[in-house]
Amino acid sequence: MALFKINKGEIMNFVNSTQLKTDIPSFDSGDTIIVHNRIVEGKKTRIQKFEGVVLRRRGSGSSETVIVRKESNGVGVEQSFNIHSPLVEKIEVIKYGKVRRAYISYMRNRSGKSARIKELNKQ
C-alpha cells in the first residue's frame, strides 16, 4: 500500500515548472519586441535577432507561444516562437502598443500608415 497518492497532473506540473524561464518581460499583443533566437548550423551556433510586432501570445506554462510579425523588403514575415524554449536566448521589449484585441490578425492586411499602432508609455 502506497503512503502518498500523487496523481499524474501534479507530477507534470512539477516537471513543467522546473523548465520555465523566469527572465521573460511582460508583453502583450501590439508590443514591439526583439527575440534573440539561437540558430544551430552544423557545429556552429549563432544568435539571430527577430524584431517585430506581437500578433498573439497564447498558451501557458512550458507551451506558451508568441507570433511575431515584421515587414522585410515589403514582404510580411511571421515567425512563431516557443517562449520557454532553450533556443530562445532572451526577449527584449522595444515599445508597448495599445490594441483592443488579443489576436491582431487584421494587421496582415495592412501596410503603411494604416499598420501603425498607438504607443503606450509603460515604465
UniProtKB/Swiss-Prot annotation:
PANTHER family: LARGE RIBOSOMAL SUBUNIT PROTEIN BL19M, RIBOSOMAL PROTEIN L19. Belongs to the bacterial ribosomal protein bL19 family. It holds the Pfam family Ribosomal_L19. This is Large ribosomal subunit protein bL19. One of its GO terms (cellular component) is cytosolic large ribosomal subunit. It comes from Ureaplasma urealyticum serovar 10 (strain ATCC 33699 / Western). InterPro entries: Ribosomal_bL19 (IPR001857), Ribosomal_bL19_CS (IPR018257), Ribosomal_bL19_sf (IPR038657), Translation_prot_SH3-like_sf (IPR008991). Keywords: Ribonucleoprotein, Ribosomal protein. This protein is located at the 30S-50S ribosomal subunit interface and may play a role in the structure and function of the aminoacyl-tRNA binding site. Transmembrane segments: none annotated. Gene3D superfamilies: 2.30.30.790. One of its GO terms (molecular function) is structural constituent of ribosome. GO terms for biological process: translation. It comes from the Bacteria.
